[in-house]
């Protein structure tokens, strides 16, 4: 099974007197959906960037399947809050572009692009240009393009942060469906407490000054969704409210620890 490991990671930025992150360890297996939460400045995105190969840690090691992570690679796909799509292309052409980079033959690109768009529930939007799509639809295209690389791990940096509440909830189901269908491990950053509880197999709570792990949770709600339980029913469960309170307390307690 694929395995991504951040081991005792410390990150220093030039001009900063203190480390941004100090001795943080996180592991993500191929069937994990790991979510990083915590207030701004605790190093969530910095750690994601180490996993992506965009930041080199001052100390510690980052590996994927035992190999050092030194640069971006096709075994990882990154989706940010602000999409990096080509607005002059259609949704299908954006996904097909990623397939072209993989060397997929022209005759197969459109078919495969349509399959990926259908997977993110955009099967009828292939001919629409990106500027015609809503924020939620654009994020779906971004996810489809990321999956075109057939990565072992999806790295998601607040991909739902700019969406309205209803679209955000719909996208949560999309992310869970993709996680189940793609068999890719996920490492995600979010500020949303409910979002973390719904999506994660494991939640890592970080605190600032410098960034460090203060607690981990294994809420189990994503497994319930995978077994067929609707998200609305999960959120209505008193156990979900209890978990939300515990996670909120852990974040606040981490700020004062």
Swiss-Prot record:
It catalyses: taurine(out) + ATP + H2O = taurine(in) + ADP + phosphate + H(+). Keywords: ATP-binding, Cell inner membrane, Cell membrane, Membrane, Nucleotide-binding, Translocase, Transport. It comes from the Bacteria. One of its GO terms (molecular function) is ATP binding. GO terms for cellular component: plasma membrane. ATP binds at residues 38-45. It is a peripheral membrane protein. It is found in: Cell inner membrane. Disulfide bonds: none annotated. InterPro entries: AAA+_ATPase, ABC_transporter-like_ATP-bd, ABC_transporter-like_CS, ABC_transporter_ATP-bind, P-loop_NTPase. The keyword Translocase applies. SMART domains: AAA. Gene3D superfamilies: P-loop containing nucleotide triphosphate hydrolases (3.40.50.300). Residues 6-233 form the ABC transporter domain. Its EC number is 7.6.2.7. CDD domains: ABC_NrtD_SsuB_transporters (cd03293). Belongs to the ABC transporter superfamily. Taurine importer (TC 3.A.1.17.1) family. The complex is composed of two ATP-binding proteins (TauB), two transmembrane proteins (TauC) and a solute-binding protein (TauA). PANTHER family: TAURINE IMPORT ATP-BINDING PROTEIN TAUB, TAURINE IMPORT ATP-BINDING PROTEIN-RELATED. Part of the ABC transporter complex TauABC involved in taurine import. Responsible for energy coupling to the transport system. This is Taurine import ATP-binding protein TauB. The lineage of its organism: Bacteria, Pseudomonadati, Pseudomonadota, Alphaproteobacteria, Hyphomicrobiales. The gene is tauB.
